[in-house]
UniProtKB/Swiss-Prot annotation:
It comes from Neisseria perflava. Keywords: Ribonucleoprotein, Ribosomal protein. The gene is rplL. It comes from the Bacteria. GO terms for molecular function: mRNA binding; structural constituent of ribosome. This is Large ribosomal subunit protein bL12. Homodimer. Part of the ribosomal stalk of the 50S ribosomal subunit. Forms a multimeric L10(L12)X complex, where L10 forms an elongated spine to which 2 to 4 L12 dimers bind in a sequential fashion. Binds GTP-bound translation factors. Belongs to the bacterial ribosomal protein bL12 family. SUPFAM superfamilies: ClpS-like, Ribosomal protein L7/12, oligomerisation (N-terminal) domain. Forms part of the ribosomal stalk which helps the ribosome interact with GTP-bound translation factors. Is thus essential for accurate translation. One of its GO terms (biological process) is translation. Pfam families: Ribosomal_L12, Ribosomal_L12_N. GO terms for cellular component: cytosolic large ribosomal subunit.
Length: 123
């Protein structure tokens, strides 16, 4: 019996975030492609205006500090990940936790993580 697209979608839908990450890496290796987003060139002169009015920020966990357990709990609350995935992120710091969030949300996440003992960067 042949595997259908629905079978594949069902199987992919049941994977964890870490398993999906491994799957993407396997596709990249097997087919020699990259899953990285392609940057689109904007109109000339728009770069300076965009740099002045940055509205989207990335929250990066620089290090977990001494209170790793507390940081893992906060990472789980922020990202909605499971315990293992959150622990892997904390252990693998520096890692980007959230991308494209507002300045207020980025500062709130930074405050929560720093209260738990982590070092955080907003980019």
């Amino acid at each position: 019996m042949a595997i259908t697209k629905e079978d594949i979608l069902e199987a992919v839908g049941s994977l964890t975030v870490m398993e999906l990450n491994d799957l993407v890496k396997a596709f990249e290796e097997k087919f020699g492609v990259s899953a990285a987003a392609v940057a689109v060139a904007g109109p000339a002169g728009a770069g300076a205006a965009a740099a002045e009015e940055k509205t989207e920020f990335d929250v990066v966990l620089a290090s977990a500090g001494d209170q790793k357990v507390g940081v893992i709990k906060v990472v789980r609350a922020i990202t909605g990940l499971g315990l293992k995935e959150a622990k892997d992120i904390v252990d693998g710091a520096p890692k980007t936790l959230k991308e494209g969030v507002s300045k207020a949300e980025a500062e709130d996440i930074q405050k929560q993580l720093e209260e738990a003992g982590a070092k955080v960067e907003i980019k």
